[in-house]
């Protein structure tokens, strides 16, 4: 899968239960559109969406499950329960929060990575800082993504792409670095790849019409 996404675009097709497009059928159609536009892979949330997208596109999938727990701020594939659910799908890679925050039930991120690898799948580390990226490489993750920059209280807070973190990771770790988070234009995508990103994930700017519409209406205010 890593060979497939190298230098190419990954599109995140997600709509949570409180969003207008929440539907596995709709996400499948969105993924078909992304494929027709040239996406090399899809990042998808939830077993039903993953199964639907795999069926209709046959593209490689990065699977996640977003689930909230009372005893942790981590919600992207937080525990072994979510990993086990994802391993029952045909997703080629599983992404999980690899920040330094405490996991639900006191679980250990290394155990999750080992479980993913034991089933022959790849593991992506969603991180927010350089330190977390370095640790992710030590833990055996196959790639690292800037997904959570700005989403942890101790990481750089910004409304734009964290190109600084991307550059630091590219210089420091040997595993592929994926740029993800707040990429809103083709120019930002190209800049990420020019700075050394192995691949990049674009989500809301392509697949969330309410977010796209708001960018237009905000300019009128």
UniProtKB/Swiss-Prot annotation:
E.C. designation(s): 5.1.3.9
Disulphide connectivity of cysteines: none
InterPro entries per the UniProt record, alphabetical: Aldolase_TIM, NanE, RibuloseP-bd_barrel
Recorded catalytic activity of this chain's protein: an N-acyl-D-glucosamine 6-phosphate = an N-acyl-D-mannosamine 6-phosphate
Family of the protein in this entry: Belongs to the NanE family.
Transmembrane segments: none
Keywords of the record: Carbohydrate metabolism, Isomerase
Gene Ontology terms for molecular function: N-acylglucosamine-6-phosphate 2-epimerase activity
Induction record: By N-acetylneuraminate.
Catalytic class of the enzyme: isomerase
Pathway info: Amino-sugar metabolism; N-acetylneuraminate degradation; D-fructose 6-phosphate from N-acetylneuraminate: step 3/5
Family matches, as CDD domains: NanE
Cited Pfam families: NanE
Chain's role: Converts N-acetylmannosamine-6-phosphate (ManNAc-6-P) to N-acetylglucosamine-6-phosphate (GlcNAc-6-P).
Keyword Phosphoprotein: no
GO CC term (a single one): cytosol
GO BP annotations listed: carbohydrate metabolic process; N-acetylmannosamine catabolic process; N-acetylneuraminate catabolic process
Protein name listed in UniProt: Putative N-acetylmannosamine-6-phosphate 2-epimerase
